[in-house]
């Protein structure tokens, strides 16, 4: 999912809406394809190296927030990152620190008064566990996030990535909403059951009423701001609910979103029904 700093919105009167990308735009498709290629080219590389490559690609682009959002989705949904080391990094550090303690003080370059330098400590620690100094260096801090290696990457198509991005924008809007009102029209009962199951599974506080004619429903969901005062966990559950709504054929969604710029006025209303046109391939 996208964090709030990556959310792009537009304001029209008292309404605030996500700024969806045009999934048919060649510019956006080229950007998505370029990012996918960067990830694919950095197999077995450290996360820090991959992030540096992404930063170089971003440069002075005015759409850097879109790139960062797309990259986050690739990291979260399509990458497997893990610790790659010949021994657990914690054990390697214990061995290195034990050797360094015996020779304290250890210097970077030996001199007349200090004969043991860092490279000697690393080499001796490696000998104690059958590893070379280079292997010890590689694994010593392999558990830091920036040193996690890209173990596998399952690339989406540029179209799928852009579609997923639009869904993520809508989800990010729900992190800080006060209330969501969903109207669903006539549909297969199985889809309605799936939607209500998602509401219950995510433990969302809600009320349900039937629409006139008995073919549709109106669902009012309490948002994370209404009761929990920006509870991140509840906000995430609210966002996770959205893809289940997208399975329905006829629906509308509006959310009341408090805005710091409108503290003395009414809350803004976020409208989300248009997202269905651009995200069909993601669900």
Q: What function would you assign to each model-found segment?
A:
Residues 281-283:
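C-terminal structured domains
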Residues 1-278:
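Nuclease-adjacent, charged terminal/linker segments that flank catalytic cores
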């Amino acid at each position: 999912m996208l964090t709030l700093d990556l959310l792009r919105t537009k304001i029209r009167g008292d309404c605030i809406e996500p700024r969806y990308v045009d999934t048919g735009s060649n510019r956006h498709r080229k950007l998505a394809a370029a990012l996918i290629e960067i990830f694919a080219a950095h197999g077995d590389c450290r996360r820090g190296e991959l992030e540096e490559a992404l930063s170089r690609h971003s440069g002075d682009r005015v759409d850097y927030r879109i790139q960062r959002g797309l990259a986050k989705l690739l990291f979260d949904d399509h990458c497997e990152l893990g610790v790659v080391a010949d021994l657990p990094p914690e054990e390697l550090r214990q061995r290195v620190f034990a050797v360094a303690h015996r020779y304290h003080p250890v210097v970077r370059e030996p001199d007349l008064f200090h004969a043991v330098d860092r490279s000697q400590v690393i080499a001796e620690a490696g000998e104690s566990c059958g590893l070379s100094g280079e292997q010890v260096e590689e694994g010593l801090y392999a558990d830091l996030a920036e040193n996690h290696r890209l173990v596998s990457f399952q690339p989406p198509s540029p179209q799928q990535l852009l579609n997923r991005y639009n869904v993520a924008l809508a989800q990010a809007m729900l992190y800080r909403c006060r209330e969501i009102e969903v109207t669903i029209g006539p549909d297969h009962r199985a889809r309605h059951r799936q939607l209500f199951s998602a509401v219950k599974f995510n433990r969302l506080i809600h009320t349900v009423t039937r629409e006139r004619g008995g073919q549709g429903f109106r669902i009012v969901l309490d948002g994370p701001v209404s009761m929990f005062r920006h509870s991140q966990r509840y906000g995430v559950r609210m966002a996770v609910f959205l893809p289940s709504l997208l399975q329905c054929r006829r629906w509308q969604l509006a959310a009341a979103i408090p805005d710091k710029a409108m503290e003395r006025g009414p809350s803004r209303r976020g409208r989300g029904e248009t997202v269905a046109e651009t995200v069909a391939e993601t669900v």
